[in-house]
Amino acid sequence: MFKPVATFSIENFGCRATDADAAALRRSLLASGLSLLSDHQHADFVVLNSCTVTAAADSQAREAVRKIHRANPEARIIVTGCYAQRAPEEIASLDGVAWVVGNSHQTEIPELLRDFRGKQFAGSPGDASPTTTDFVALSALNTDAMSLERGPAKILTGDIFAQTSLQAAPQDGVAGDRTRPILKIQDGCDKRCSYCVIPFVRGRSRSLAPDVVVEEVRKLVRAGAKEIVLSGINLGSYGRDFQPRTTLNEMVRRILDETALEQLRFSSVEPQDVTEDFVGLVVSSERIARHFHIPLQSGSAKILRAMHRWYRPALYAERVNQIRHAIPDAAIGADVIVGFPGESDDDFRTTYEFIDVLPLTYLHVFSFSARPGTKAAEFDAPPVAATVIKDRARALRALSQRKATEFRASQSGRRLRAIALARGGTNWTEVLTSNYLKARIPGRHPANRWYDAEIFADEE
């Protein structure tokens, strides 16, 4: 009897690391025989790759589940990612959710769904225990626990800290809107910032083996990639879990020496890892994008201590100024959190003034969100009023806009090499420069090709 090919759609929430996870999952599901749809309304399976960095991220995932279930009641919704790892029971209680799969078991999803139309699963939805408490392969589970018949959502999670290595996540090429593939070479984090839940849902720091990284880059280049973004939860810690240790710098040198990749970009690197050697490496090769993203979080030494950050404002300023001296046209971005418990008006003023004098070119501003299980969620310090947090975030975003405008003006009139993105209008194409400026070139052009773009100060 003929059975139509099962279809799936996928939606991603969160950072570049989750982008990379979603791309790998998409490709694995395609390889398992499922067909990808661009919309959720007609898909047999809908995979939501969740984020849990803030309460708003959790809410966004829950709302997505409700919206998809209303639009497509017959779809089996699979929620995976960081929120699924942190609070699986919470997600499982939502109507429409068939499976909750934590980061610990995310790579098992294709096996879970591959033969859903061609294989009869034993048992009924209520036969099995809803959770697994230890990390186990899906093949080792009772098949009753894999039933996709209607019933309560099943939970597949495990101890994320049981994972001590990182496997290659096959990435998409450059088809569609995925012009600049993200290659995740590191996952997890051994730091314990007081506000951050990510180590508890991503596990300890793990690095992709150098030979595997080189081969993955080669595959992407053969697939047509011109630029690759290296990503990780704590990218600068790459290689510290190996014996003998290696470093991100050494890995980058191998990529430059052993592959034909035309441009490499970094997602985010912590300030203590932006060393003189690291900056010198960027200076030494035109194949590395002139773009640094360095999390700051606060310009107040008091708040940085409370956050359990492992640097102080003076070191951060030193690293940023070092970049600006070595690479005058580099883009330098930062993450900042406002409203951390105990952040006074003076603390915020210190942060604002600190950022104001630094040669940063843009900010990502976040409002503090207490995460269950983190130290900051238990602080005795008085919480900052929501209205105050909103005002502070607005002030920093305005500062970010001013800095971005000033940086763009400093580049006005230059013609810069830029890669075409899969975006544009009827008579223009959007491109991205090495130093993270978007520009428009006349005409409609294929994505993933290099062009010379003139920078205009008044262009968005």
Language-model segments: which ranges?
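Proteins enriched for Cys/Gly/acidic motifs involved in redox and nucleic-acid/cofactor modification
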Residues: 1-231, 236-238, 292, 313-325, ...
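Conserved SAM/AdoMet-binding glycine-rich loop
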Residues: 77-78, 86-87, 222-345
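Terminal RNA-binding accessory module
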Residues: 376-460
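A structural micro-motif
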Residues: 34-35, 75, 98, 261-262, ...
